[in-house]
Swiss-Prot record:
Name listed for the protein in its UniProt record: S-adenosylmethionine:tRNA ribosyltransferase-isomerase
Compartments, as annotated in UniProt: Cytoplasm
Organism in which the protein naturally occurs: Streptococcus thermophilus (strain CNRZ 1066)
Family in the record: Belongs to the QueA family.
Entry keywords, A to Z: Cytoplasm, Queuosine biosynthesis, S-adenosyl-L-methionine, Transferase
Gene behind the chain: queA
Pathway(s) annotated for this protein in UniProt: tRNA modification; tRNA-queuosine biosynthesis
HAMAP family: QueA (MF_00113)
EC number: 2.4.99.17
Gene Ontology biological-process annotations: queuosine biosynthetic process; tRNA wobble guanine modification
Chain segments annotated as transmembrane: none
Amino acid sequence: MNTNDFDFELPEELIAQTPLKQRDASKLLVIDPVTREMTDTHFDHIIDQLNPRDALVMNNTRVLPARLYGEKTDTHGHVEFLLLKNTQGDQWEVLAKPAKRLKVGAKVSFGYGRLTATVTEELDHGGRIVEFSYDGIFLEVLESLGEMPLPPYIHEKLEDRDRYQTVYAKENGSAAAPTAGLHFTPELLQKIEAKGVKLVYLTLHVGLGTFRPVSVDNIDEHEMHSEFYTLSQEAADTLNSVKTAGGRIVAVGTTSIRTLETIGNKYDGQLQADSGWTNIFIKPGYQFTVVDAFSTNFHLPKSTLVMLVSAFAGREFVLEAYKHAVQERYRFFSFGDAMFVTRPSEK
């Protein structure tokens, strides 16, 4: 298939620049690939789409304030870092600007010396391995000096950094939020649990590659970035029990889907405690082994995320749903509205 097969018209004014005042006040488009019905509702009614025997699976990763602004210690030239992943100890892979000035041995100071980075290795495309030195606890220093790494299509300043975290964010490590989870409130989760739905958490640390456009014409030639995931034995046991009892596995967001399907593919559709790196690329033709339904935001044209939704619900129907969302003035991308998709019965 061609990348252009997943293109659609999107007016720029529909790209949400700020979160809504109330998380669950966002709109929700419910689509059924079997009946091809579309229903416009609001996110706090997602509970109506969930059955008492279901499990709702959420990604509890926490976004690091991973954007740092500092200066070279010798020339005082301005430097920007975006932390990508912790390689070991105090060593991190970062995206540096301007990278050409940062050779091995270069030192960068942040917060008037509260945090210092030494370049230990040069990578391609502006990447660097750096070793940080600091007093105290690294994450506390980062919280005080770093800024949230908002997506490139958001130009407004984020007034409250907690709005780019889910209410259940726990495990530090992401360069971007698992945005499908931003709509949930503690009260809504309590109501869902009270209905008899199991709340299950996994972790996938979202990498910067989530914003990387597909640069090839043939989607089969696209290579996904790798992201680290973890599923506990307790979570795996709960999900297997739900499946056995006839309940559905309902994933919140594409990161939860990719984690569950990665593990399901390893263990013949069953789930076990597992952790590792995944670069699974879910596109039309993929056969789902674990996930029965999911919620997700509205994604970029020609993105791998639109391809994933199309693999689940069919490309033509997904593009119809996106056209409907544009006509109904749904808000798109990270701070935008959501979609709920049920599993086609024939799969």
